[in-house]
Amino acid sequence: MASKKVCIVGSGNWGSAIAKIVGGNAAQLAQFDPRVTMWVFEEDIGGKKLTEIINTQHENVKYLPGHKLPPNVVAVPDVVQAAADADILIFVVPHQFIGKICDQLKGHLKANATGISLIKGVDEGPNGLKLISEVIGEHLGIPMSVLMGANIASEVADEKFCETTIGCKDPAQGQLLKELMQTPNFRITVVQEVDTVEICGALKNVVAVGAGFCDGLGFGDNTKAAVIRLGLMEMIAFAKLFRSGPVSSATFLESCGVADLITTCYGGRNRKVAEAFARTGKSIEQLEKELLNGQKLQGPETARELHSILQHKGLVDKFPLFMAVYKVCYEGQPVGEFIRCLQNHPEHM
């Protein structure tokens, strides 16, 4: 069997952390081509191109400083060139940009290429919810899997132990992806319920914004635990409403579900920015620049898409926590009123 060529589409914080793992495994395992391409959105860093820095210093000095990438990971500034020969495409870019990237890649991929999305977000489709893996799969005509879990990028790059979940309908492909990405400290469970895995990954960012509001307003651990639990209830209810396939509670107990929700509500960037938003009154855009090096926040954007989907279906009242996050972020509702969505939650009625 010819060795599989791998391309990582994206090179931010999470993309670079995954490149470290994938590059290391591809160099050692016969089933993969050792040369891993990584598409890098070209930027100028102190008069040098970011791709040149990565290819000479083997470090993404902007998005994952202090971590060496394997020398077999090659940064490529042209996405079509990076992906042209790939058998496996790993998508890891902010979900706002995926449509444009797919437009560029369309018609330029290998006939039997497959993809895996690490992107946490949802899109609006004609029938309401559209998952990012569906957007990619339909645009490019390739089968898609997903990887979601309690994986804060800096900790993964530090090789601290964590778990993750791959959702893949084809068991053989799931096993291949596990071989490509598993390490002693990055442990993978493969499940077949792809949709539920991906919904968990998208919706937890909205809950984390609520958790950050909680922290910024000075509420305690009990309140935050309530945000996490009520958020999980809304995630499960949303999945059951919008997915045609099975939605089992067991999937919510995998790393992609409750574990990712907990870590994001305590350690993720959505929580951090939401806390600063509640404390300072600065805009989300301003805080992205100050706290995230200009990287985009997924939680508020996902809340906006959820609002549109739920409004279309007349179900806004059934998801008070999701909608409270939307109202604070986009409709100018005072953040101090966030607690009301908890006090009047239908779970207690």
UniProtKB/Swiss-Prot annotation:
The active site is at K204 (proton acceptor). NAD(+) binds at G10, S11, G12, N13, W14, G15, A153, R269, K296, Q298. It is found in: Cytoplasm. It catalyses: sn-glycerol 3-phosphate + NAD(+) = dihydroxyacetone phosphate + NADH + H(+). One of its GO terms (molecular function) is NAD binding. One of its GO terms (biological process) is gluconeogenesis. PROSITE patterns: NAD_G3PDH. The modification N6-succinyllysine is found at K289. The modification Phosphotyrosine is found at Y326. It holds the Pfam family NAD_Gly3P_dh_N. Keywords: Cytoplasm, NAD, Oxidoreductase, Phosphoprotein. Its EC number is 1.1.1.8. Belongs to the NAD-dependent glycerol-3-phosphate dehydrogenase family. This is Glycerol-3-phosphate dehydrogenase [NAD(+)], cytoplasmic. It comes from Pongo abelii. The gene is GPD1.
